[in-house]
């Protein structure tokens, strides 16, 4: 029999089983522990008091480095430090309807290099481990339990391209929806991507009730490639075909995200292109006001009247359309704003001290939660 290590990691099944056998514990002990921590989000103190064996378990893989609460709305930015010493961010969004959404990161930095995105400007991605993705959920859930609030939705719309970390993101979703772990419905989870057709299809097949979103931002191939360099790898036709195939698997609307950029993609002609591209796909379009970033001074936000006019054109064609406005502007939690000088410095230090190529990482972006996610649950 393999002896249990001095401390074991919460989401490592083999390590946990070795610990159980080493301590000769009833299998129900760990079932109850996971139930209290992952479903009820009880505090560490409560878990340690109820289960002395928890002292031998690493309950968290992330260290909460800083918390910032918005003074103007219900957003909270959580800054976590990873074991590698780099920083990631999650955002809690307390919606006026009473729903609460957590926006999680899947990578440190991002390789997609979107022109409008702070993260994309700042470096090559380093994948977060499955346990680092899940610990964002655990720690946010514990905060919300203290407020007597429930976590309604989890969206992979934070830092990084989830489908560039497909293995760990998929495993995280497996555990989020596993009855013996978080036991969440897949319909409460959303994954947003800039467009990786094969990965989108794999997720849809594995989780038919999972919500998926595409960061489209233009229905003109040339324009999209300018603002999303990764668009060169997957054409608009390929993305349309992927969504069409996904909708033969999933009986639900597909989310389309469209960032409104002045004189780039916000004309009536752009709206008509979008309508034509969507065609007979069952989608919900979310129009997103742009938050300016220093690294892209040539990009500007569309005016509110232009956004509303664009929305009217889409609605007149029969498309479900929502204009979304930011939460957390005062704490830099809104789309494209999550950048920290400290992480720049840590990334520079990592470049000097680490030899592995995947250490060249860095910066943070959280996109706003997609409106309409709640309406998908029972479809």
Swiss-Prot record:
Domain Radical SAM core: 96-332
Family to which this protein belongs: Belongs to the radical SAM superfamily. RlmN family.
Keyword DNA damage tagged: no
Positions bound to [4Fe-4S] cluster: 110, 114, 117
EC number(s) stated in the UniProt entry for this protein: 2.1.1.-
Residues annotated to bind S-adenosyl-L-methionine: 160-161, 192, 215-217, 291
Active site: 89 (proton acceptor), 335 (s-methylcysteine intermediate)
Cofactor(s) this protein requires: [4Fe-4S] cluster
Cellular component annotations (GO), alphabetically ordered: cytoplasm
Disulphide linkage map: 103-335
Protein name according to UniProt: Probable RNA methyltransferase RB6963
GO biological process: rRNA base methylation; tRNA methylation
Organism (species): Rhodopirellula baltica (strain DSM 10527 / NCIMB 13988 / SH1)
SUPFAM superfamilies hit by this protein: Radical SAM enzymes
MF term (GO), any: metal ion binding
Co-factor note (free text): Binds 1 [4Fe-4S] cluster. The cluster is coordinated with 3 cysteines and an exchangeable S-adenosyl-L-methionine.
Pfam families the UniProt entry points to: Radical_SAM
Subcellular location: Cytoplasm
Source organism superkingdom: Bacteria
The organism's taxonomic lineage, starting at the top: Bacteria, Pseudomonadati, Planctomycetota, Planctomycetia, Pirellulales
């Amino acid at each position: 029999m393999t002896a249990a290590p001095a401390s074991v990691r919460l989401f490592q099944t083999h390590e946990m089983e070795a610990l159980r056998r080493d301590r000769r514990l009833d299998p129900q002990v760990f079932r109850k522990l996971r139930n209290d921590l992952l479903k009820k989000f009880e505090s560490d103190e409560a878990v340690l008091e109820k289960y002395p064996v928890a002292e031998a378990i690493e309950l968290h893989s992330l260290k909460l480095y800083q918390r910032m609460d918005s003074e103007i709305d219900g957003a909270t930015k959580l800054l976590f430090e990873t074991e590698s010493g780099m920083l990631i961010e999650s955002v809690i969004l307390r919606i006026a309807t009473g729903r609460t959404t957590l926006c999680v990161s899947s990578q440190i930095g991002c390789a997609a290099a979107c022109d409008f995105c702070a993260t994309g400007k700042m470096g090559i991605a380093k994948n977060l481990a499955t346990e680092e993705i899940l610990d964002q959920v655990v720690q946010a859930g514990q905060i919300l339990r203290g407020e007597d609030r429930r976590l309604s939705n989890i969206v992979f719309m934070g830092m990084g391209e989830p489908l560039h970390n497909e293995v760990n993101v998929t495993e995280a979703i497996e555990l989020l929806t596993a009855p013996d772990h978080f036991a969440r419905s897949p319909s409460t989870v959303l994954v947003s991507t800039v467009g990786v057709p094969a990965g989108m299809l794999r997720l849809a097949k594995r989780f038919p009730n999972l919500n998926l979103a595409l960061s489209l931002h233009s229905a003109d191939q040339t324009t999209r490639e300018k603002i999303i360099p990764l668009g060169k790898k997957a054409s608009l036709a390929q993305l349309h075909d992927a969504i069409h195939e996904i909708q033969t698997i999933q009986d639900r609307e597909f989310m389309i995200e469209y960032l409104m950029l002045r004189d780039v993609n916000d004309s009536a002609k752009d709206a008509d292109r979008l309508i034509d591209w969507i065609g007979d796909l069952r989608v919900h379009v979310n129009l997103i006001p742009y938050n300016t970033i220093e690294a892209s001074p040539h990009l500007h936000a569309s005016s509110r009247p232009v956004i509303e006019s664009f929305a009217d054109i889409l609605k007149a064609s029969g498309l479900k359309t929502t204009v979304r406005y930011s939460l957390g502007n005062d704490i830099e939690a809104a789309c494209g704003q999550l950048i920290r000088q400290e992480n720049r410095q840590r990334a520079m230090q990592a470049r000097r001290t680490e030899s592995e190529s995947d250490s060249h990482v860095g910066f943070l972006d959280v996109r706003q939660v997609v409106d309409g996610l709640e309406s998908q649950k029972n479809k």
